[in-house]
């Protein structure tokens, strides 16, 4: 946000625990974008009537339920579903959420400088529509786990599609490419 001229507003712990107090902070500070988990968004938008109409909702950290997606679309300026494990600096893919959101949450496409692969157990590509494990590579990838060489070797594997020495993270998440080029 700061690189784009925005101001960062940090809510106090007591405000985060009180949806009404958090909505008041958003209004008073003129917040135009907020990142939160679906659980927190659910509490914040409950009983809200137009108070968040100018806020861009960034949703991540948990799966985005279809009902909440539709509620957010109707009560905020825009909704972006974010996906990414801590090992890849939390945002790896994004998807704009629209009013026709269904129960299947798209996690979208990779962000800049991020590559995603869907592979089977032999690390072979999976065809469009077929399920496979998600692997993530790119500039946001961590080097591994501190003092956990065995786990690092298991989860951070050689990236056969990158430059020599490149690694990719084995997420353990099952996904598929949709026919529209979105990860689901």
Q: PLM features: what roles do these ranges have?
A:
Residues 78-81, 96-184:
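AMP-dependent adenylate-forming
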